[in-house]
Amino acid sequence: MKRYDLTVAVTAHNEGLVAHKTMRSILEATKRLEEKKISYEILIHIDNGDQITKDYFKRYAKMPNVVIYENNFGDPGPSRNFLAQKASGEYLTFLDGDDLISDNWLVVAYGALIGATEEVIVHPEGILTFGTEVNNVLTIQTETLPREKDTIVLLGENRWCAILMAKTSTLLKFPYQHLTGGYSHEDYVFNVETTNAGIKHIIAKETILFYRRSNNSRLSSSNNTNQIIPYMEFFDFAKVREFRADSHADVPVEVSLKRKGYKLYKKIRDNNFLNYFITPPAKLTLKVLNKFNQKNKLGKIPEFVVREWAKINPLETQLYPYPFILKRTQIYDPSDLSMIGETYLKIAQSVTHTPDYIFMVPWVVRGGADKVMLNMMKAIEEIHPGSKFTVITTLPNKNVWAKMLPKNTDLIEFGKLAEGLPPYEKDELLSRVITQLKCKRLHIINSEYAYAWAYKHQELIKNHYELTVSVFASCFIPESNFTCRFSFDDPFIFDIYPVVKKIFTDNQTFVEESVEKNALDEKLFKVQYQPIMDEIKPVHHAEANKKVKVLWASRVTREKMPDMIKLIANKLDPKEFQIDVFGAFSDDVDKNFFTGVPVINYRGAFDGFSSLPTEDYDILLYTSVGDGVPNILLEATAAGLPILASNDGGVHEFIQDEKTGSLVKEIRDVDGYVKKLKDFRKNPKKYEEYVEAAQKLLEERHSWKAFIKKMKEDF
């Protein structure tokens, strides 16, 4: 078999006659090879090509140093690998069928390779995006950075394009991965793998790739389907955690990414040139360009770019450096940006193990959903001793109940650490974190951001993850005057149900509502009544016609209807009733909301129901715009307190009116609450009977043993 100095490998699929311009630029570049007496061959691989493309390339079939292949791989990675295996050149360059190269690319890159004293990969210095209705963007590529800095940049940014030249042996040693099922960007993976192996990426000075932006390219398809790269050893948390503080890539810290970068992101997000880079992750990088850096670069297009830009015009008349185009062309250096990597580095400090389960929640605070998570974790640990967990919080709130997490749990405060990143970068970062955790079991509880991530990455989840969710109820929307409802099952679960393995809930009512509303398969749901492990205390005894001390304990937020407490209190005699309100105020309720109401005594925040002096109270009043089976009802029952509750969601499954407690059927019926409170004052004895029945139900249905039995069926 004849050997060559260089193999020029062209990948094509459906470029049609556009490929003619590509081939003309290649043939112009080969003239420089011939001048230097560098032997070469041209291999053309048509992958799933259309007829126009196939017919066009037939004209080269009889050229002595051209070979044409046809296959149906449907992926750039296998196409490049095929060409590497067929190559007879000592060195090999990959080119795409719709781009153009400056006529010096082949000879300069070849010279850089043979002059290297170590194994290297060469890329063009400039990449100029062009195309119909596409803004020109000039990307300046730079050489490999010190390893730790390169890691931080590569974490969120593919530094080098897919157009390269290297020893054929290098490309055979590091074949492109065939990525499917939600994974993509084989060139990004190649760059990371070779960098991890210690191979330097260098630049062929003053060479340019003219990248034609088209909407039908496979690379654009990768961008539009939210595909990501798989786990990479180079980004392993343990390695990144060891980085020195001074290894961080240089970032202009005085520029607020939230104010500058996101402002620019919003300005350019709808422009076609976002996909300008030959590599898909460049879409991400343009979105975090900030004006601060660009002000110093606009108008300073390197002379070699202007020269080659004009020189290519006879081959492609769309390309010419008109003064007005030069003025508006933005310059971009992929090595400049590292915000994703910097944030990843901070996250890495919280990662101490490979988890068996990942929980994605908005926060870890004092709440029923948080207790559900804690119960699940405790049960899993009992079923599978030694299990490890990672909890990812997606809102920037303070996680006041982080102390309640099991010791074998890593808490990643993603919402706090990633605050300020534009949406695309935030999604890219979360994808990287989840992938690098190497855990296939994901569980979402009430996190809108996690649901949005799952919606974007359904193909990934379907093929590589086991996704379960917990959801408990729909609830009235206060702004609708309590006539409309919100629920996580629609749209969040409804949008992703094909990739959800199981929907856990704490009440049957929600299952019935969701099946009726959304036609979801009832088999998808699993009711797990939450356990109560508190000591069951004697039933509280209250004397008839004495002043009633009412306990109300919850977050003081509109969803818990604090306005109803005030309305109820205003209809009660302060000589006969006292309502003590416990709970931290949310931002949607004024902290002086209860001031001036004689019956109400605001007692401040509390740290779990067990911290409350329940023995001082006669009855629990519970109000809410929507619920499953609230944990506080179980806890109050265990404490021996009678319960008066609003009847919504699954509340009635535990508080059965005049059997295990007292219900107000219309949750906004002020007179209904007042009437029942007055009834309790007159007849507390019958409420003691309700508590006895409720405690019996508690022992039968809400025991830890019953909960573990249910958990074992799925975990």
Region spans (language model):
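Acidic donor-binding segment of Leloir-type glycosyltransferases
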Residues: 26-69
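Acidic donor-binding loop at a coil-to-helix junction in glycosyltransferase catalytic cores
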Residues: 182-190
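Non-catalytic membrane-proximal stalk/linker segments that position and tether the catalytic domains
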Residues: 1-3, 232, 245-356
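Glycine-rich, basic loop-to-helix element that forms the pyrophosphate-binding segment
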Residues: 71-87
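Conserved donor NDP-sugar-binding/catalytic core segment of glycosyltransferases
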Residues: 106-137
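A short, active-site helix/loop in glycosyltransferases that binds the activated sugar's phosphate group
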Residues: 314-321, 482, 486, 491, ...
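Short hydrophobic beta-strand element within catalytic cores of glycosyltransferases
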Residues: 642-645
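Aromatic "clamp/platform" in nucleotide-sugar-dependent glycosyltransferases that forms part
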Residues: 625
